[in-house]
Amino acid sequence: MEYNPFHNGHLYHLTSARELVRPDYTIAVMSGNFCQRGEPAVIDKFARAEIALRMGIDVVLELPVVFATQDAGGFAFGAVSVLDATGVVTDVVFGSESNDIGFLQRVAQILYEQPDEYQKFLHEELKKGYSFPNARKYALMRYFSMKGWNEEEVLRLEKSNDILGVEYIHSALKIGSNIRFHTIKRVGAEEKDTSFRGRFSSATAIRNLIREERWEEVRDSLPEDSFEILMREINEGRGPVFLENMGDFLLSFFRLKNMEFFERIHGFSEGLEKRFHICARQTGSYQDFLECVKAKRFTFSRIRRLALFSVFEVNKEFVEKSNAKGPQYIRILGFTEKGRKILSLMRKKAKLPIVTNMSLYRKVLEKTDLPVDKQLFFEQIDLDVRTTNFYSMFFPAVEQRCGERDFSIHPIFLRTET
């Protein structure tokens, strides 16, 4: 989840998931300060974790930045890996447009098994110049048509939440997880819908409302506790944070770099390093830069992710290793009184070391006897810390911009049982 911000659709998802599964506890794995679309969260991860706890989540875990800022496949792999590593998660419920878990499982099985016909179609679509996500979508459509699936089923692959659901299941297959997956129908506006649609407006629309300071409409779109904490963060100068706040810095940074620098960064291929190098010098605003780099095969989300990978100097080897070995720790952002009980069980069953107090993360690694890649552990945590330090520089209030928030802020503890 991203909870950027936590809106009425998220509350509907949480309530429906509880009714469907009847869990003893609820655990959410949440992006930190940067999200899958290559943008900063509108308020920081600690405030968003607090909202999630108030809304009924028992434990909030952080999805390491290296996964939170990848495409749907990398995002899902990181999230499922973290949940599986807790040793206590039995069921995962996600929202989807189709609400058809059987369909999503069939698609995931194809991606896992990689049949020859599908691989042939994928190669052909990539040669046409499509981005990988689109090439894969069209290859799957051709494969399903060949197998006699009806057109309505095939068109489901156009929907972003169905795609992400497929990736969750695919990731579980890859790591051999026994987690059971369920889906509920997504309600409200499409994610990319930028218009206010009442109580169930999209996260994109809500962020636009925040940007425009249309507070009554924001209030209508969020649960009361979510709105209250959002306004607290804004009034105290810790938000909102938007990509445009970072634009001048990012463009200046790109102008300082040569093409060889971009070639070392994860995700650069197909001439993108040249486009970044040239467009940074030919444009005067970050939005114009994005438009300049954009081409048929490159989505805006991919370009924004590459921009973040560049400024954080995330190299290809680090991401490849992370995607091969998965997250190397479980970071606790917050928990309730009830959640403290499941944390105790997690400490006995977890497959990865649990980091609660970031000041002690080195000691956590020293004491663990779990199979962890120590270098990767440090590299993943280092990226989380650096990106938090970067993010806080864009708080509106200068006095709030001090770094090392990962060390100065302890996990949120909500004393009232939910």
UniProtKB/Swiss-Prot annotation:
Keywords: ATP-binding, Cytoplasm, Ligase, Nucleotide-binding, RNA-binding, tRNA processing, tRNA-binding. ATP binds at residues 95, 161, 186. GO terms for biological process: tRNA modification. It catalyses: cytidine(34) in elongator tRNA(Met) + acetate + ATP = N(4)-acetylcytidine(34) in elongator tRNA(Met) + AMP + diphosphate. InterPro entries: Rossmann-like_a/b/a_fold, tRNA(Met)_cyd_acetate_ligase. It is found in: Cytoplasm. It comes from the Bacteria. It is an enzyme of class 6 (ligase). GO terms for cellular component: cytoplasm. Its main location: cytoplasm. Pfam families: HIGH_NTase1. Its EC number is 6.3.4.-. GO terms for molecular function: ATP binding; ligase activity, forming carbon-nitrogen bonds; tRNA binding. HAMAP family: TmcAL. Catalyzes the formation of N(4)-acetylcytidine (ac(4)C) at the wobble position of elongator tRNA(Met), using acetate and ATP as substrates. First activates an acetate ion to form acetyladenylate (Ac-AMP) and then transfers the acetyl group to tRNA to form ac(4)C34. Belongs to the TmcAL family. This is tRNA(Met) cytidine acetate ligase. It comes from Thermotoga petrophila (strain ATCC BAA-488 / DSM 13995 / JCM 10881 / RKU-1). The gene is tmcAL.
